[in-house]
């Protein structure tokens, strides 16, 4: 590693570490805040400018990688041909494609959910602003995405159920703080959004499967 050598390479490594460590530390602090102090976290998020690029680089892609990587490691290490998402046996030759599908589905689901937020926002007196909607879709999904790291063992799928409950709670807070959805309409807004997401996911999945893509 360049970090344990002397000279220019060590200096370059120190510079890179100095650039990326503060961002990583901020991201980790935000994740912990969403899990432990969600109200405070959403207050901070609501005040921040919406940056699609930042959300993709710091949260969506890195966190979406956790579940497929853990799943592939678990399947390869323990030879347990299992799928935490669907519960069916996965053939050895399909393990990597299953991981890639999980990654693709996780990322696309976040962007689609944000689009659904934007689509139905006017029904609840909220403005259509995709970056803000993506903030809610991304930060709300953090518990489920982080829990994906535990899927190296099949039994840990139970943790995902707990994470899903916390994700629903984060959405319940976030749509009010960031999207200005009326307090009394939050449950309905989230319910409709997730129902639409589930329906679209099923349709897209069936279409891709029939086309032989997955």
Language model: regions and residue ranges:
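Cysteine-centered motifs
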Residues: 2-3, 13
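N-terminal hydrophobic targeting signals that begin at the initiator methionine
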Residues: 24-25, 214
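Hydrophobic alpha-helical transmembrane segments and adjacent short intramembrane/lumenal linkers
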Residues: 114-202
């Amino acid at each position: 590693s360049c970090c344990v050598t002397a000279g220019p390479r060590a200096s370059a490594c120190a510079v890179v570490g100095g650039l990326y460590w503060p961002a990583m530390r901020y991201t980790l602090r935000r994740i912990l805040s969403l899990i432990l102090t969600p109200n405070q976290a959403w207050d901070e998020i609501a005040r921040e400018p919406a940056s699609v690029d930042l959300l993709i680089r710091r949260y969506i892609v890195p966190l979406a990688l956790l579940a497929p990587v853990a799943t592939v490691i678990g399947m390869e290490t323990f030879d347990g041909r299992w799928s935490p998402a669907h519960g069916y046996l996965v053939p050895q030759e399909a393990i990597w494609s299953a991981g890639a599908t999980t990654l693709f589905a996780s990322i696309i689901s976040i962007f689609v959910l944000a689009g659904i937020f934007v689509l139905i926002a006017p029904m609840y007196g909220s403005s259509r602003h995709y970056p803000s909607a993506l903030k809610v879709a991304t930060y709300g999904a953090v518990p489920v995405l982080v829990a994906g790291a535990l899927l190296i063992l099949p039994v840990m799928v139970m943790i995902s159920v707990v994470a899903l409950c916390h994700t629903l709670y984060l959405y319940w807070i976030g749509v009010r703080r960031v999207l200005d959805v009326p307090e009394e309409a939050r449950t309905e807004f989230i319910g409709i959004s997730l129902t639409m997401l589930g329906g679209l996911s099923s349709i897209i999945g069936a279409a891709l499967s029939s086309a032989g893509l997955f």
